[in-house]
A protein has these predicted regions:
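P-loop NTPase switch/coupling surface
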Residues: 1-157
Length: 157
């Protein structure tokens, strides 16, 4: 996936290829490295947007403890569009700025995510698991190789 950023402070245009194994931002002080890192972090961790997109894609088991999500390319693209739009409208919250300052600093900021068939094929072919713990709940997720479904089991501690 590629992320295209325009007019982010001193950064007039940047294309970041997230398919690389490592991303290294280097340059002189005040060249926009931190701004780009903040935007990428915010884009990839948009929980409210992710929840709204996933609501229609989730299938629960009868006990309500296991969820299966069928991740389609269209679902990923929808999420990325919503997350990009949300970020463009809420840049002040990322950088701790007032609404007035946000409008002044980021009025021409643009963010675009380019997600193509090759990206989805890599996702489809990958196998992974994840673990997350919050409050008194544990979340265990897994995705099998050559599958578009992610299964998440929720248990209490």
């Amino acid at each position: 996936m590629k992320v295209v950023i325009d007019n982010l402070g001193v950064v007039k245009h940047a294309t970041i290829d997230l398919d690389k194994n490592i991303l290294l931002f280097c340059g002189p002080n005040n060249s926009g490295k931190t701004y780009i890192a903040y935007v990428l972090n915010a884009l990839l961790s948009q929980s409210p947007v992710l929840r709204s997109v996933m609501n229609n894609a989730v299938m629960k088991d009868q006990n309500g403890t296991t969820y299966t999500i069928n991740i389609t390319k269209e679902l990923i693209v929808e999420y990325l569009k919503l997350a990009s739009s949300y970020l463009q409208q809420n840049m002040g919250s990322i950088f701790g700025l007032s609404e007035e300052m946000e409008k002044s600093f980021f009025r021409s900021f643009k963010l675009e995510c380019i997600y193509d068939d090759a990206d989805y094929k890599r996702f489809f072919n990958d196998k992974f698991s994840l673990y997350y713990q919050a409050d008194d709940r544990k979340y265990n997720g897994r995705k099998a190789k050559n599958s578009s479904e992610i299964t998440i089991e929720i248990s209490t501690m």
